[in-house]
């Protein structure tokens, strides 16, 4: 794996895959390590990663660095400033694929900001989803990102779990073994899950292709019928 800042000095040995990683998680470094580790095992390919951050988060990182106490840990803010590009510069046509992480904003509404509520970077995020859709760039939307995308494209709402947060590792069954993403998966796989919300199952199944599910998780992996998005409500990237 090569980051764009050192790719020019590197000597790739295989076919190059260019990926964009939009990271909206608070645990910036841990999230990126979890996502990059499996990418390093792709035999015969070198992966060039470009990190992106919504401009509002980049601006906030710069402010937090400036205002930090002398002994404060500002490594994750410095990392964003040094290695991440602003989301407003993202052109999906320059990449072979994209990954959209979750975000620690589960309690915020999925729709546009109103009366000061909602995610500060919502408009920029939605514009990014539209650009990806228009360019048909293969994209994995994880957890919160999947909920936002499903709501934006198909008006699929989400519901808070009455039983409380669903946490654990669940075996999800392969519902579409003939699908190109699932033909080597076998009967199913274990999926780490940590979430308070579930997408409306009836509307979800009416608009996308369910790929994997279980009774506990509902649809855990789905794909556009005619589009570039893969929606994953769990976290395959989590460490064992």
Language-model features: locations:
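Amide-donor transfer/coupling interface in amidating biosynthetic enzymes
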Residues: 1-58, 63, 88-90, 94, ...
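Intrinsically disordered, low-complexity coil segments
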Residues: 40, 58-75, 111-120, 134, ...
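Glycine-rich, highly charged phosphate/nucleotide-binding loops
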Residues: 68-93
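Short, flexible loop segments at the rims of nucleotide/cofactor-binding pockets, characterized by
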Residues: 74-78, 115-119, 169-170, 188, ...
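Secondary-structure junction/capping motif
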Residues: 83-86, 119, 223
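Short, Asp-centered acidic motifs that coordinate Mg2+ and/or phosphate
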Residues: 97
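Cysteine-nucleophile active-site neighborhood
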Residues: 100-176
């Amino acid at each position: 794996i090569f980051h764009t800042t050192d790719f020019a000095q590197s000597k790739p040995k295989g076919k190059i895959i260019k990926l964009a990683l939009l990271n909206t998680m608070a645990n910036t470094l841990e999230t990126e390590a979890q996502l990059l580790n499996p990418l390093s095992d792709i035999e015969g390919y070198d992966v060039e990663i470009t990190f992106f951050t919504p401009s509002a988060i980049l601006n906030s990182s710069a402010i937090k660095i400036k205002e930090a106490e002398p002994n404060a840990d500002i490594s994750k803010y410095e990392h964003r400033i040094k290695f991440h590009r602003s989301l407003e510069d993202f052109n999906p046509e320059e990449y072979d694929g994209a990954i959209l992480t979750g975000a620690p904003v589960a309690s915020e509404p999925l729709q546009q900001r109103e009366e000061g509520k909602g995610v500060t970077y919502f408009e920029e995020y939605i514009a990014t989803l539209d650009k990806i859709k228009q360019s048909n760039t293969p994209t994995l939307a994880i957890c919160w990102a999947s909920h936002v995308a499903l709501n934006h494209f198909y008006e699929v709402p989400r519901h808070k779990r009455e039983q409380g947060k669903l946490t654990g590792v669940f075996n999800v069954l392969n519902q579409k073994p003939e699908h190109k993403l699932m033909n080597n998966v076998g009967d199913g796989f274990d999926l780490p899950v940590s979430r308070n919300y579930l997408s409306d199952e009836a509307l979800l199944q009416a608009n996308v292709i369910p790929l994997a599910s279980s009774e506990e998780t509902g649809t855990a992996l789905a794909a556009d019928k005619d589009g570039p998005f893969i929606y994953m409500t769990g976290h395959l990237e989590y460490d064992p």
